Amino acid sequence: MNYNEAVKLLTSQGKFRIELGLDRISRALERLGNPQDKLQYIHVAGTNGKGSVCAIISTILQEAGMKVGLYTSPHIFEYTERIMISGVEITKFDFAFYIDKITKIIEDINLTEFEILTVVMFKYFADKNVDIVVLETGLGGRFDATNIIKSNLCAVITHIDYDHTERLGNTLSQIAFEKAGIIKPNSAVITSEGYEIFKDIADENNSLFMLVAPFEDTSNLALNGLHQQQNLSLALATIKYLFPKISPVQIQKALKKVKNPFRFEFIESKNMIVDVAHNPNGIMALKNNLDYYYPNEHKRFIFGCLNNKDYASMIYQLFEAKDEIYFYHFNNPNSVTIDELQDVCPYPSKEFKEKFDYTDGKLTIVCGSFYMMKELCSKL
């Protein structure tokens, strides 16, 4: 099996099929000897900011000399982006090898795409003897496939807001409860969110509850944006709690190396910002960043999103009458149509069809979904 065949097999499982629950992945991992039990974890959940927190933590641990496994989702360009060891993606050869090997063993268990990837990740990291895994949840926490782990060094919970409400609940308290499912016995939970449920579940599990305030000095952090204050505070609190001997010099050196593509990322050659903000809270953070860093720029937006998102709220938050607005319908069965987007937009808009003259002095902002970025980047 080669890489393309592995991807084809994965997508045949239903690329956007989501079935929360731990029974299937538990049976699959048992057949492989439960490789997840051989590893140590920092487990990260939350609505927004998970990827940035994971990137900061893993980079600091790498700088301190550890062999660090990093598991994130979704990917932008290739599946291999999701599984990394010390900043290096799993090779396409290894990815195909593990997909082929594992799916033959568990072929009678109807795993989702995300569950297969999670099983591959556990087996790969165990085989490579990583020192620690920085583990990002896929959706929610309590019944997310990553929560098959029995213990963690600590749980980290980032900002909580409305997203995936059809699965996680319609109130912030319900969503927080689902995220709190990653809190394990005799461990710790580090969060910037003061929900009582976090402390209650921590107490029930004899685990430390640590509430941290935003860390304001992000001047050395390679990631841009006001919202990174909160992400940095969580990452640094986690490092200082678990690894107090990591020096300030190592931390500052690592912060300058952190990479997390398409998070308020500025592409100078095109005077363009690319941001995977894909829910109302993420769009609000993007809007705040644009108002703060580029208050007087003539802005041109390219926006597309999935139909399970509150795109009406995102559109109302983001756009102003003076903006140029372009909508993009990408190749995804759940992509919102141009007509649907235009129906809720209070301002004139057009369909994005071809690249612009990027020397015209306008700031182009691309946002709305992870899933359109690979396709759209080829047209920019």
Label each residue range with its predicted role.
Residues 1-16:
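Charged, amphipathic alpha-helical linker segments immediately N-terminal to NTP-binding catalytic cores
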Residues 6, 22, 26-37, 63-150, ...:
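ATP-dependent carboxylate-amine ligase catalytic core
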Residues 12-26:
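N-terminal pre-Walker A segment at the start of P-loop NTPase domains
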Residues 38, 127, 132-135, 143-156, ...:
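Nucleotide phosphate-binding/pyrophosphate-handling subdomain across enzymes
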Residues 40-44, 52-69:
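A conserved segment at the C-terminal end of the G1
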Residues 71, 188-193, 301-304, 324-331:
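Short internal beta-strands
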Residues 142-143, 151-206:
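Conserved catalytic-core segment of NTP-binding enzymes
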Residues 193-210, 225, 271-272, 312-365:
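C-terminal helical cap/extension that packs against the catalytic core
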